[in-house]
């Protein structure tokens, strides 16, 4: 899980979702998981 000021899709499987007021990226590639901090 990367915590970033700016979350971006890193590949075509990444999806940007909003969960509990936080922007997150979920993906089939575990290294692509991100949340906005």
UniProtKB/Swiss-Prot annotation:
GO terms for cellular component: cytoplasm; ribonucleoprotein complex; ribosome. The gene is rpmJ. GO terms for biological process: translation. This is Large ribosomal subunit protein bL36. NCBIfam families: rpmJ_bact. The keyword Membrane does not apply. It comes from Chromohalobacter salexigens (strain ATCC BAA-138 / DSM 3043 / CIP 106854 / NCIMB 13768 / 1H11). GO terms for molecular function: structural constituent of ribosome. Pfam families: Ribosomal_L36.
